[in-house]
């Protein structure tokens, strides 16, 4: 039983290890051929380049509080981004826990407007702010004047979904395997049966039936 899994690089956790099994239960969150995630490092480069391109604006990026936020922060650090990263209150304790387990996330500060030496418009120029996706459309995000709104998610492959969320900077960074990685994992596990759940089951089941007949010919 795989649960949620990804095959892309993540500096904050151990990689997924396929184990040969008779029955494999896989998720199918991105179980359609349209979902082919780019290399995660390319998305970090897009974010860094955008921050440099718009030094007078802040970037507010939607990330899930557990896992996605810490992965993005750590990858930014590994790319040499040493500036303070500002985080929503819901991320604080989880990031502190990661630090206790030895994950160096660099300097983080709460994304507040109190006790700052300048007004928010001036203080947050050129800064990176991370928040849960729900906060992007909330009153919370309106404290940052003229922000560039981004979202780090596999769903950003779908341009219409990004548009609906008011996302200016879609970053295709996912903690779920895409179509190709799901199929690669199935081949590596080499099961006699595949059970598919949570997502686009029919398309993946159809593809599995074809591939399993070749694996166990």
Show which residues each predicted segment covers.
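Core dinuclear metal-dependent hydrolase active-site scaffold
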Residues: 1-14, 46, 54, 112-145, ...
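His/Asp/Glu-rich metal-coordinating catalytic cores
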Residues: 1-67, 78-79
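Active-site metal-binding loops of divalent metal-dependent hydrolases
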Residues: 3-5, 28-30, 64-66, 90-91, ...
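Residue-level preference for the first positions of well-ordered beta-strands
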Residues: 23, 56-61, 84, 126-129, ...
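Hard-cation-handling environments
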Residues: 44-57, 63-125
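A C-terminal functional module that forms or caps the active site or interfaces directly
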Residues: 149-187
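Proline-aspartate-enriched helix->loop->beta-strand connector
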Residues: 186-192, 196
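Conserved small/polar residues in nucleotide/adenosyl-binding loops
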Residues: 215-217
